[in-house]
A protein has these predicted regions:
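H-loop (His-switch) and adjacent beta-strand-loop-beta switch element
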Residues: 142-155
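ABC family nucleotide-binding domain
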Residues: 1-145
Length: 155
């Protein structure tokens, strides 16, 4: 990527990368739908159009019955699905997932990895950062970095 001004970099990042955070980063006063459509609203899309744009993603992630719930009314797995839906809402070129299963129980973690596999099969590239070797084994390609140095590549 060429050197860009900070504003240009922010616009590019918001358009091209969908971020999935370990601790969800949901806005507690927003309901599920508001959290999911937020990236589209930031881009200037109106609420009704943004909600329509996200309808399929909400269905895909099994959140139809939760759209009016606030984050404190959701399980960890549901919060992570909202985080994933929000990352997908702007149709980014790549998803960047930081420890996406780190705050989840085993069953919810497996559910997220299964969802990532489905999303990847649908053409969504995913770059996942994890310290959990079992989670890394779910990836098609693994790059291992130790002390800032590339030490191993698989796949």
């Amino acid at each position: 990527m060429k050197y860009r001004k900070r504003e240009e970099t922010e616009i590019w990042r918001n358009k091209e990368i969908g971020f999935i955070f370990q601790n969800y980063q949901l806005i507690p006063t927003y309901n599920v739908l508001q959290n999911i459509i937020m990236p589209l609203l930031v881009r200037g899309m109106d609420h009704r159009t943004a909600a329509k744009e996200c309808k399929e993603t909400i269905r895909l992630l099994g959140l139809e019955e939760r759209v009016t719930h606030k984050p404190n009314e959701l399980s960890g797995g549901q919060k992570q699905r909202v985080s994933i839906a929000r990352a997908l809402s702007a149709k980014p070129a790549i998803l960047l997932a930081d420890e996406p299963t780190g705050a989840l129980d085993t069953a919810s973690g497996k559910e997220v990895l299964k969802l990532f596999a489905q999303l990847n099969e649908m053409g969504n590239p995913i770059m996942m950062i994890t310290h959990d070797l079992k989670v890394a084994q779910a990836a098609k390609r693994v790059v291992r970095i130790e002390d800032g140095c590339l030490t191993e590549m698989e796949g």
